[in-house]
Amino acid sequence: MNMRKTKIICTLGPAVDHAETIERLIRTGMNAARFNFSHGSHAEQLARLNMFKKVRDTLGAPVATILDTKGPEIRIKTFADGPVTLEQGQGFILTTDDVPGDGHRVSVTYANLHKEVGPGCRILVDDGLIELRVQKVEGHEIHCEVENGGPLSSNKSINIPDVHILLPSLTDKDREDLKFAVDNDFDFIAASFCRTAQDVMEIRRLLDEHHSDIRIIAKLEEPGGREQRGRDSGCGRRVMIARGDMGVEIDFTE
């Protein structure tokens, strides 16, 4: 019997927190269940994982489990009075100080961002829907002009395609989540924002410390990771192209 090489990975979240729904996913061809650790607590994820395993074992289906790490991402923080609307041409400030957000400024999660950007840098917010251009940096404040405006709500992602940001490859949360993966017998780790082979090796070392042979999928989400993959096969035998974040930073034709 020929087995198809293309596999179907389904993300299990609150929308499928029913045994009947998981059973339908498995019966219609799901090969791997992805658990996104950018969201939810360990207690929530464990309840979902146990439900999945119970259904999988009842059906006797060979469906793998993937823990997708949050990784070293940058986000805006919260707006005090809910979403705001940014207009093209207006000024807007990103700050590394912890302040209530409003229509003129908002805090960011990365404490050193003001040290790593400068005038002319593009800053893309909310998967590129909002585009800012840095005009100047004063202290902890990054003064920008809005080049592409629109509605903006709390906790949206930030991408900076023109600068290599010096974020750590593994956060404290990632380390806790990797331990969770070991304790609960996950088959794969999808390692977010891998930029170098060393990023993969650091995860491998941590897993080795726990005597785990969980396999690693290197997720390429920015141009640096893509270029490193071209130079260094040590980035891993398994690669996932995260078209959301990658698509924000480079053209789809590339």
Predicted regions: what is each one?
Residues 1-254:
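Non-catalytic helical/linker scaffolds that mediate oligomerization, partner binding
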